[in-house]
């Protein structure tokens, strides 16, 4: 993990980008053969994305809470995310096809979800204090110091 930045900073959002949440919820632990492939597929996709910046992926972080695993991803655009999702020569499409075949079995052993948000300059507010330089939206697009003109959330949003 990156060294923490000991001053207050904010994300330096210069253009539109995408926040993509994707994850899974293990509904039936003992049906390991149904949820384990989905669990194991995600890290290989993330490695592929970091190795190929031309795909438009910026960064990701994984969070676990109980039975739910969520990967928070930042992308340059919705079009880049959509293009990657449909590329048959990349890791996502084959993994999705295999998962979908298992998911239609109707056991409900694993649930999946994703949410996509378009983030535009002037419509997002961030604040980081004593956080690692690679954390969150600021880690994806870069950070800049909070100044007297950006003290409040409203000022940072503008």
Could you describe each region identified by the protein language model?
Residues 1-68, 80-83, 107-158:
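Short S/T/G/P-rich N-terminal loop/turn motif that feeds into the first structured element of a domain
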């Amino acid at each position: 993990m990156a060294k923490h930045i000991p001053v207050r900073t904010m994300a330096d959002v210069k253009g539109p980008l995408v926040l993509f949440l994707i994850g899974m919820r293990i509904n039936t632990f003992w049906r390991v053969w149904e949820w384990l492939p989905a669990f194991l597929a995600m890290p290989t996709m993330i490695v592929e994305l970091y190795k190929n910046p031309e795909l438009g992926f910026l960064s990701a972080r994984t969070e676990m809470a109980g039975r739910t695993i969520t990967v928070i991803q930042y992308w340059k655009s919705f079009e880049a995310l959509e293009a990657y999702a449909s590329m048959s020569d990349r890791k996502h499409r084959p993994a999705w096809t295999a998962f979908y075949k298992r998911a239609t079995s109707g056991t409900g052993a694993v649930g999946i979800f994703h949410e996509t948000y378009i983030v535009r300059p002037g419509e997002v507010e961030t604040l980081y204090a004593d956080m690692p330089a690679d954390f969150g939206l600021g880690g994806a697009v870069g950070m800049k110091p909070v100044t007297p003109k950006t003290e409040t959330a409203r000022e940072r949003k503008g």
